[in-house]
Amino acid sequence: MDKKKLNPLARFRGFIQAGATLLTNIHLPNFAKGTLYQGSGKYVCVPGLNCYSCPGAAGACPVGAFQAVIGSSKFRFSYYITGILILFGVLLGRFICGFLCPFGWFQELLHKIPSPKLSTKKLKPLRYLKYAVLLVMVVLLPLLAVNELGMGDPFFCKYLCPQGVLEGAIPLSLTNAGIRAALGKLFTWKACILLAVIVGSVVFYRPFCKWLCPLGAFYALLNKVSLFQMRVDTHKCV
């Protein structure tokens, strides 16, 4: 049976993804200005992976916000950020990944490019990497690897997240000469990661989501108790 008949939402999934991406980055004029929205909306976390430094971003990235709190020299457990992540996970779970995440949609669009497609069936063990990324890069390193002031870097955002380059560094550098001049080896490293994800997304279906995304890992942990649950149609498996 067609999965779109089983789930009416699937029929409108592309429109929902586009709408969610637009709402998450609603401040479109900022792309031309090379500025960031800095209003009260930035105190609210969006559900998907979306860079705080994107000119159009209407809210904060939950991964970046969580790292900022635990990497602070005055670290206190953030009930707000942890609570909102749990709320997103319990209410929506992996629905966020499939319908509301801008970077997930970006990878899906790339996968539509005509090319040979490769199965990830034999690469299933790689899916556990995202849990390691969540534990090590999002939690442990920002908490434990601190400088003399007791502050930790947002390791995932700084060294691994390709969304920051795509939505933040690239559009800002196009309109801001100062940012262009400041780009260095770290930008080159992150740009290479983004390029690898782009190429990988053409031949694999959402490789970053499957293997490296810590936000997806967190939501996956709550999938069994979420109101929207991801179920596998075994008759469709090959």
Task: Give a label for each model feature.
Residues 1-238:
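Non-ligating segments of multi-cofactor redox enzymes
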